Amino acid sequence: KKLANNHDNILVHDAARCCLPQDALSRLIQEAGTKAEGGILAIPAADTIKRSDTDGQILETVPRTDLWQAQTPQLFQAGLLNRALSASNLNGITDEASAVEQLGIRPLLVQGDIRNLKLTLPQDEFIIRLLLNT
């Protein structure tokens, strides 16, 4: 059974991001909800980024001017998302936006929120607990 029409918006969210602020979600829906290319929450990279070799030595400092850290949720029309995730080559795909990018489509970056943390590493739990207890 078809769950959504091709032009219905789908929000894909990581359960690991348990601190999504309502205003960030509203901003994503407002700014990307009418865009055919969809959009994602993201924050500009604030830390200095280093590229290393396989021995762990610095090869270079990467300019962070145009670097963004992707967050979720990510918003796409159902038809586009289905087409992107049905592609034959999903190697290297780390999120829905990268699958859409493989189609030659450039999703919109919508200002995310630093509080939209991802619980990935053990130390993340400490920070998230502090945030949730405030």
What are these regions (language model features)?
Residues 19-110:
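Conserved core of the sugar-phosphate nucleotidyltransferase
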Residues 13-14, 44, 77, 121:
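Residue-level signal for inorganic ion chemistry
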Residues 10-13, 108-111:
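Short beta-strands and strand-loop turn motifs
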Residues 7, 13-16, 72:
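Short acidic donor-binding/metal-coordinating loop in glycosyltransferase active sites
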Residues 1-9:
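Active-site nucleotide-sugar/metal-binding loop of Leloir-type enzymes
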Residues 16, 89, 114-117:
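Glycine-rich "substrate-gating" loop/helix at the edge of Rossmann-like oxidoreductase active sites
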Residues 4, 30-33, 133:
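Residue-level signal for alpha-helix termini/capping positions
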Residues 116-134:
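Hydrophobic helical membrane-anchoring modules
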